[in-house]
Curated annotation (Swiss-Prot):
Acyltransferase which mediates the conversion of lysophosphatidylinositol (1-acylglycerophosphatidylinositol or LPI) into phosphatidylinositol (1,2-diacyl-sn-glycero-3-phosphoinositol or PI) (LPIAT activity). Prefers arachidonoyl-CoA or eicosapentaenoic acid (EPA) as the acyl donor. Prefers sn-2-LPI rather than sn-1-LPI as the acyl acceptor. Lysophospholipid acyltransferases (LPLATs) catalyze the reacylation step of the phospholipid remodeling pathway also known as the Lands cycle. It is a multi-pass membrane protein. This is Membrane-bound acylglycerophosphatidylinositol O-acyltransferase mboa-7. The keyword Ion transport does not apply. It comes from the Eukaryota. Pathway: Lipid metabolism; phospholipid metabolism. Its EC number is 2.3.1.-, 2.3.1.n4. Its main location: membrane. The active site is at 350. GO terms for cellular component: intracellular membrane-bounded organelle; membrane; mitochondria-associated endoplasmic reticulum membrane contact site. Keywords: Acyltransferase, Glycoprotein, Lipid biosynthesis, Lipid metabolism, Membrane, Phospholipid biosynthesis, Phospholipid metabolism, Transferase, Transmembrane, Transmembrane helix. The chain crosses the membrane at residues 4-24, 53-73, 79-99, 104-124, 153-173, 220-240, 244-264, 354-374, 421-441.
Length: 452
């Protein structure tokens, strides 16, 4: 028994228990009619059981956000909520340094992260619906019904995705109440995800056992060759990916069972946006025996994560719900340095560790590096691809080795640990990116101003 327990960390075992319990609960909740308030109460009870009094951290920002939504000027509500929520997130993470409170870490931090996304997301949903309430020919789908106070708190603490993600909108939660979904069979969708577990779980357990992250923190890393260090970083990345592949296979299955993110395939649903062909959706939404899919909740595109040609495609395929959240509520709404601002918000959201900022800061430069290189090696108009020699060379050097290095920074977290390992591989990726980034900034076309 001790050997079995030793295969994973305590946190991993807790997450496994939470996921399995949530999966069983989702089956039961579906049979009872998929009630939102009951699911919110269950999620709150689970959070209270796992983190105890530390649930006060998330309750605090929920109450503050609801107050802002109720009393702030309508047009300014999203800005106030966004700013307040992230300021609060930073405050509670540092509060234990100067107040007699427990640190926001582990499961408490994860709950805080998910609720942060939900608070800001529902605020934008409400505001967009209010701004476009008189649009008769809307080309985009807006919130169909404003939530009550209890429904908001139920959404914030809904057990589905509360501990692992994926993120989903309040409108997606409302859509899951469609009676037509009660007759839809989720078995094929769930089965396809459980097939993934047949290879992702063994791969995680084996690599996690034989290639511990602490090896990168030890001085022994300096005693092996540069090539060996790169290989070890690649194996650490395998541990990280297979852990996430496994967790999200179950997390997505929970969403599927509850009908979250399930739409008619013909309506062309997109991740967290839902159906994009609104005419088709309106015609099929209440019909039974219609082909459905879960594209709106698929959080990973594993083939692209593993085999895409570049950084941008690889990043977009990873944690797609959060990537889309960042695109909708950050990238599309800022006026300058969009990639850099988006990566900064992503780093702040993940935590206060230097490793997050180091990794996400380099990601922004990697995107610029890739743009410059791709311009130098254009796509063949006949094949739609770049030369095969270039794709092989770029993928297996900058792209793959780069992602592996960035993953070590994300996992090691502390500045000293990240520096310890990154210096052993000579900071090769940032040093490669910086000249290209400077070149891109210097040669950026200035915006023309129209003088009247």
């Amino acid at each position: 028994m001790e050997k079995i327990i030793g295969l994973m960390s305590r946190d991993d075992w807790v997450y496994t228990g939470l996921l399995l319990f949530s999966f069983a609960a989702s089956c039961y909740v579906r049979k009872l009619g998929n009630n939102i308030l009951a699911s919110g109460a269950l999620g709150f009870a689970m959070a209270l059981f796992i983190i105890g009094p530390r649930i006060a951290y998330s309750l605090g920002i929920c109450a503050i956000a609801v107050g802002i939504q109720a009393f702030a000027p309508k047009k300014k509500v999203p800005f106030y909520v966004f700013l307040t929520t992230f300021t609060y997130l930073m405050f509670v993470r540092f509060a234990h340094y100067f107040l007699p409170v427990v640190e926001v870490a582990s499961h408490t931090n994860v709950i805080q992260l998910i609720i942060t996304l939900r608070i800001i997301g529902i605020t934008f949903e409400e505001n967009d619906a209010w701004l476009h309430k008189n649009d008769e020919n809307a080309t985009k789908r807006y919130l169909t019904r404003m939530p009550t106070l209890l429904e908001k708190f139920a959404y914030f603490y809904h057990f589905c995705g509360l501990f692992t993600g994926p993120y989903y909108t309040y409108q997606m939660l409302l859509d899951s109440q469609n009676p037509a979904l009660q007759s839809w069979d989720p078995t094929p969708e769930v089965t396809s995800r459980f097939v993934r577990l047949l290879w992702s779980v063994p791969a995680f357990v084996i690599t996690n056992h034989y290639f511990p992250l602490d090896s990168l923190r030890s001085d022994a890393i300096w005693e092996v060759s540069f090539f060996t260090r790169l290989v070890y970083a690649a194996l650490i990345f395998v541990v990280f990916k297979t852990r996430v592949y496994s967790a999200w296979a179950i997390a997505e299955s929970i969403c599927v069972i509850l009908g979250i993110g399930i739409y008619p395939a013909a309506s062309n649903p997109k991740i967290i946006v839902g159906p994009t062909d609104l005419k088709v959706f309106e015609g099929l939404r209440d019909k039974e025996n219609v082909e459905m899919n879960s594209d709106a909740i698929v959080n990973l595109d594993i083939p692209k994560v593993e085999f895409s040609d570049g950084f941008r495609d690889g990043m977009k395929a990873w944690n797609r719900s959060v990537q889309t959240w960042l695109a909708l509520y950050v990238h599309s709404r800022v006026k300058f340095m969009r990639v850099e601002t988006t990566m900064l918000v992503s780093a702040i959201w993940h935590g206060t560790y230097a490793g997050y900022f180091m990794s996400f800061g380099v990601v922004a430069m990697c995107a610029i590096l890739e743009d410059v290189i791709f311009k130098l090696v254009p796509v063949n108009p006949e094949t739609g691809l770049r030369p095969q020699w270039f794709r092989i060379l770029y993928t297996h050097t900058i792209r793959c080795r780069g992602f592996e290095m960035l993953a070590t920074g994300f996992l090691l977290k502390n500045a000293s640990d990240v520096h310890h390992f990154w210096s052993s591989i000579y900071y090769w990726l940032p040093l490669l990116c910086v000249p290209f980034y400077i070149y891109s900034v210097k040669t950026a076309a200035p915006k023309l101003k129209l003088v009247v």
